[in-house]
Amino acid sequence: MLVRTLYISSSVGSSNMLCNHGLKVIGKYSAIHEATRKIIVRSYSKETIKKHNKQAILNTAPIEFIANNSPLVGISDVNTIKEAAKRTLRCTDDVTDDQTDEIHPHLPFNVKPVDGKARAALKKEKNSMSLDIKKTMEAYVQLTKPRLTILVMLSAICSYALSPYPATVTELLCLTVGTTMCSGAANAINMGREPDYDRQMIRTQARPVVRGAVTPKQAFSFAFGMGTLGTSILYLGVNPTVAALGLSNIALYSWIYTSLKRKHIINTWVGALVGAIPPLMGWAAASPLTHPGSWCLAGLLYAWQFPHFNTLSHNIRNEYKNAGYVMTAWKNPLLNARVALRYSLLMFPLCFGLSYFNITDWYYQIDSGLVNAWLCLWSFKFYMQQRLNYSSKIKNDRVKFNEGLATANVYARKAFFASVLHLPAVLILAILHKKNRWDWLFEDSENPKLK
């Protein structure tokens, strides 16, 4: 015979019983109150059943009965209880342990109330930790000078794409990652060495080392890791020549150029060499550096530095002077403008050389000529205005000099923005006009078999 136990919970008392066929009451039921609102039926352990009824048989598949909320009225004997249970109870699988003999349901874990203030403080602490990690990561990214690093990387990639020799995806990926890391390492060392000087310039006051987000020692450690990994990737994934160029660029920019910035105006020419090395790295990844096309690309990047930087430094020349940087913009303003124009004009023969040495087609001269002319126009206006400003007629007239200087500032800004767009335009056009780039469009029409 199957035996199940029934526990009825009331506001006054309780009763234990066995239901189904041969129902037998184990405990007293007379104390059940009429206002019972909840009935819970549980299977009791074998020991509990035997304590009250030695002949009872333990049910190995216990069932939990959960009552509805309807009240039980007029319960007076065993039969009444049995009938009421049949009418009001439904059966569900027991989710409790079959050895349970507790009369009250319980949770298998301790419930501890959490104070609202403590919870808010914990949430604030977690958010603060997350914010600190984010700020630290942003600071290290800023150490690499992301915009400058991207420009360096793109110049290497464009040079690699213009190489007449076949390229591979693996080699391109290693070149991209390695060049990016080497550039980031050089910039991090530069920032680590100049916090006292950068603090005096509005343009550089927000750098991470200046505001204390990263210490100089941390910047140097970061640069060492980036530089080591970058040169290793270039050495193993590309070739030793590219790795040597990457390492030399780190030393040239972070030590020689950075030191010369406070000693002599020649630092600008040294810095231009730094910009010319990435195209050589891209070319050397797939082709020998004996090809004259590689030096045309390097010369293009070298010449571009002067109209770009000289016009930029012109408008912040006083900041450079106050910070102790020796720049042509304030040491010799007329020379600064003349050099910007001179190297803008040099773009024409360098672009011509790309077509002459079969790197691009001859149509490239039309496109690049328009872009070069646009840059030269603003560089020329900048130079002519500065030449007028420092003439004997204007230089000694304070009012006219200030008016002329304001005009020169406008031309310098326009020349600077022209240079920002000039370099990507010239490189992209070179890729589009690469020699034999579009021959596949005419292959079918030139094939006599298909005519």
Swiss-Prot record:
Instruction: Cite a single GO BP annotation.
Output: heme A biosynthetic process
Gene Ontology MF terms in the entry: protoheme IX farnesyltransferase activity
KW Cell cycle (keyword) present:
no
- Main localization is mitochondrion
Top EC class per UniProt?
transferase
A Gene Ontology cellular component where this protein is annotated is:
mitochondrial membrane
A Pfam family of the record is UbiA
EC number in record: 2.5.1.-
What sections of the protein cross the membrane? Answer: 149-169, 240-260, 265-285, 289-309, 339-359, 414-434
Q: How does it sit in the membrane?
A: Multi-pass membrane protein
* Keyword terms of this UniProt record: Heme biosynthesis, Membrane, Mitochondrion, Transferase, Transit peptide, Transmembrane, Transmembrane helix
InterPro entries from the xrefs? Protohaem_IX_farnesylTrfase, Protohaem_IX_farnesylTrfase_mt, UbiA_prenyltransferase, UbiA_prenylTrfase_CS, UbiA_sf
Q: Where in the cell is it found?
A: Mitochondrion membrane
Task: State the family it belongs to.
Answer: Belongs to the UbiA prenyltransferase family.
Entry function:
Converts protoheme IX and farnesyl diphosphate to heme O.
List the PANTHER family: PROTOHEME IX FARNESYLTRANSFERASE, MITOCHONDRIAL (PTHR43448:SF2)
Quote the protein name from its UniProt record.
Protoheme IX farnesyltransferase, mitochondrial
The record lists the organism as Candida glabrata (strain ATCC 2001 / BCRC 20586 / JCM 3761 / NBRC 0622 / NRRL Y-65 / CBS 138) (Yeast)
